[in-house]
A protein has these predicted regions:
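TPR-adjacent "capping" and linker segments in tetratricopeptide-repeat scaffold/adaptor proteins
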Residues: 65-74
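The alpha-helix within a helix-turn-helix
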Residues: 17, 28, 56
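Conserved small/polar residues in nucleotide/adenosyl-binding loops
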Residues: 404-413
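Helix-turn-helix/homeodomain-like alpha-helical modules used for DNA recognition
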Residues: 74-124
Length: 416
């Protein structure tokens, strides 16, 4: 995609016109012809200042051109993207930029501030974000607002400004789009665009996420030399840690416990003296516990799972399963009861995979459960749900159950 810098005034006109839901004819009536406004917005015409002022006035735009203000804001925006690449805290710099929101929207930095805002708030699905800015917008908007509405509105505006973006801006726009879509193939297309535009470890991490989601684990393994070299050249410990964690997780998904342990140990050692340990600790111990459970290293599995502090559904599932295998009926019943309670919550409504995972464990409490035709039916429904709702790692953990039911089905066929 060939991208070049556009006239900032044209970008402002176009962005604000779109935001207000106005057509070109409505904006330029009595000032200039539609074709001239179109050229201004596309950056293909150098606008007459007298006409530009009239167009700005019609849209209520106070165009920000103060050099000191723009220089300071540019530095803060660059700091935000630097922090994003190196895994550093961004709330402080976001608050500084959010305080200048209205002025930055009407400045040559309009695309950048929208990108910063949607990147920041698209992270709300996995971590806490500052909502005071959104709350302040709610007071201004008659119909109210929330994070999702904010994201939808600004991503829609950015989509209209794609041809005004340079390579890096388009890469960051692609990053947001990858976070907002649920389709794996579409995600991968966006991830590839991120890497094409950034050509750094942040882009490579996006590619790795795509490979992980599509269970292309070999592709993650093959990236090791290239990724480690890039991370060392950047001096980026966070990226290096993230690669080792993802590579270890890829091995965990196929129960390769020895290779998983190698990469998770590298992750732990790199993190042990940093502030990032808490970010990775729980996922690391959960994955290790689940993998040790799958390969029959039960005591090590119990040790790892006991280090996970939150009692969410998946942790309770692994603990209940583990205690059933260890013959600890009372402990298994305890975690099954928690799972049943969690399934009654509103946020679990419609999660068929979780419901069937619970039912499968309940059936495992019965003697000779694999010989029960009802268990075969349950496993078939569970596998369909996992394929539809979960990643390959979830499916792989039931490989032994599939073998049991396959043998049982063969026995039933021979009896018939």
């Amino acid at each position: 995609m060939n991208r070049k810098e556009k006239n900032p005034a044209g970008m402002i006109l176009r962005a604000e016109r779109i935001r207000q839901g106005k057509g070109q004819k409505e904006v330029c009536y009595g000032i200039c012809v539609v074709s001239y406004l179109s050229k201004i917005e596309r950056g293909s015409a150098e606008p007459d200042m007298a006409i530009l002022k009239q167009l700005f006035a019609r849209l209520g735009i106070n165009y920000e051109t103060d050099s000191a203000f723009l220089t300071e804001s540019r530095k803060q925006i660059d700091e935000f993207f630097y922090n994003l690449q190196y895994g550093l805290e961004n709330e402080t710099v976001w608050k500084k930029l959010a305080g200048k929101w209205d002025w930055l929207l009407m400045s040559p930095l309009t695309i950048d501030i929208r990108l910063v805002s949607v990147i920041y708030y698209s992270e709300s699905t996995w971590k806490e974000v500052d909502e005071s800015f959104i709350e302040s917008l709610m007071k201004k908007e008659a119909d109210g607002n929330d994070i999702q509405n904010f994201l939808n509105e600004n991503v829609s505006t950015l989509a209209q400004l794609e041809d005004c973006m340079d390579e890096k801006q388009y890469a960051y726009y692609s990053l947001v789009c990858s976070r907002l879509t649920k389709d794996p193939a579409e995600k991968m297309e966006w991830y590839q665009k991120v890497q094409h535009g950034l050509q750094n470890t942040l882009g490579m991490r996006c590619l790795i996420s795509g490979y992980y989601e599509q269970a292309e684990y070999d592709a993650i393994h093959r990236m090791e030399n290239r990724f480690v070299t890039a991370a060392l050249e950047e001096g980026n410990v966070y990226a290096l840690v993230d690669y080792y964690f993802m590579n270890g997780s890829a091995y965990a998904c196929v129960d390769m416990d020895e290779m998983m342990t190698v990469y998770y140990e590298r992750t732990r050692r790199l993190l042990q003296n940093t502030g990032w340990w808490k970010e990775y600790e729980q996922g690391l111990y959960y994955n290790m516990g689940a993998t040790y459970l799958a390969v029959g290293r039960y005591e090590e599995a119990l040790d790892c799972l006991n280090r996970v502090r939150s009692e969410d559904f998946l942790l309770c599932h692994k603990k209940a399963w583990l205690h059933l295998l260890l013959g600890n009926t009372r402990e298994a019943d305890h975690y099954l009861a928690i799972m049943k309670q969690l399934l009654s919550r509103k946020d679990m409504k419609g999660k068929m995979a979780e419901r069937l995972m619970y039912e499968e464990l309940c059936m495992e409490q019965k003697q000779d459960f694999t010989a029960d035709p009802a268990y075969l039916d349950l496993i078939e429904r569970l596998i369909r749900a996992l394929i539809k709702e979960k990643s390959f790692g979830f499916l792989y953990q039931y490989k032994n159950c599939l073998l049991y039911t396959s043998d049982a089905a063969d026995d039933l066929t021979r009896v018939d």
